Amino acid sequence: MQRRDAIKNIMKDIDDELVICNIGFPAKELHDIADRAENFYMIGSMGLASSIGLGVALAKPDKKVVVIDGDGSFLMNLGATVTTFVQNPNNLTWIVINNEAYGSTGNQDTYAKYLDLVDIVKGVGFKHAYNYEDIDLREVIDDDNLSFVEYNVYPGNSQVPIIDISPIEIKKRFMKVLNK
């Protein structure tokens, strides 16, 4: 299974949740699979989808928030695991699609192949950290706990067009959803 398949599977369990998606190919694949106003596509700022997701979860405690991240971005911003744990938003599910590669820059290896990301976040203090194949994602999202999910896939990018919405329009339509 590749990242695009993982995103399709994830989106089958998404209803009205707010989704913050990692930069590059993951954002383009999500846009191609299930574009909607509740999706915020990162166009830049590698490593910060988790931080933006945390901010949205804290600002909108009545809404469920799902972050779709990559292993490269996760490793780039490991400090976000500590901040997220300490803030402990019970409406946030942080999914890291681990392809052991920087998919958007040419599939160079990350160090994720030497690590267990679930063990890392458990070491920080996360009490609800899972491998995707061991859970029902809908149940995890519905649970009122901060959760982390690692989704292991093979490297590779699908042939998808660029996102045809400007960054300003992505922000405007997402903010409109937030302000409802």
What are the roles of these predicted feature ranges?
Residues 17-36:
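Acidic-glycine-rich active-site phosphate/pyrophosphate-binding loop
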Residues 179-180:
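Charge-patterned, long linear interaction tracts outside catalytic cores
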Residues 4-5, 13, 32-176:
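Thiamine diphosphate
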